[in-house]
Amino acid sequence: MIPIMDAVPGTRRHTRQVITELAESIRERDRVTYEHCRRVGIYVNRLARFMGWPRGAARELALAGLVHDLGKTWVHNEVLLKPAALSQSEREMIERHPVMAAQLLWAFDMPDTILDAVLSHHERWDGKGYPNGLAGAAIPLGARLLSVCDVFDVITTPRPYKAAMSVTEARERIQEGAGTAFDPEVVAAFTRLLDARPDFLLAGRTYREATDANDPWAAHDSGE
């Protein structure tokens, strides 16, 4: 699906319209990825607000969460769902998905906050991530938040090939990654948020199940 816009580029309405249509293209291609992106958007919105981000900035980061895996819609299912180890070429294909998403978002004049977060959400604090091998503070802050929330949702969501971790187990796994995979300060804030909001995981699942599948904004406009 190619988004068809009638809003003026650079406006909030334009941003929302583009993200809505791109999120719908993810849903049409792969409902599992769409639901993952929705939950990550909810989680990163809450984390950003907990860390003191202004409401508007947090919601913009949530939009990045909503389409952070957009690039996977160009990766063949045979690669995405492959149960065995990936070949070098297949791994390179997977590792290009943030670049492909960012290029499309750039073409639609999305804000830098969204572009940076989507492009860099697989970078690691120790510099061993992709696509650019950024390290430490060179990684955009929004991407550092998005990375933690992305991994949290992956490990707490059941899949046919793995059981879901409990919140306690996931909390420990995220903490183990502080200073290597993740920004230690973001991890510290995230664990405090989990302690302060025992319903954190449930909230993401509740929004997913209770809201209209064609309205990806319901959770983000709920005042959280």
Whereabouts are the PLM-identified features?
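Metal-dependent catalytic cores of enzymes that make or break cyclic nucleotides
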Residues: 5-224
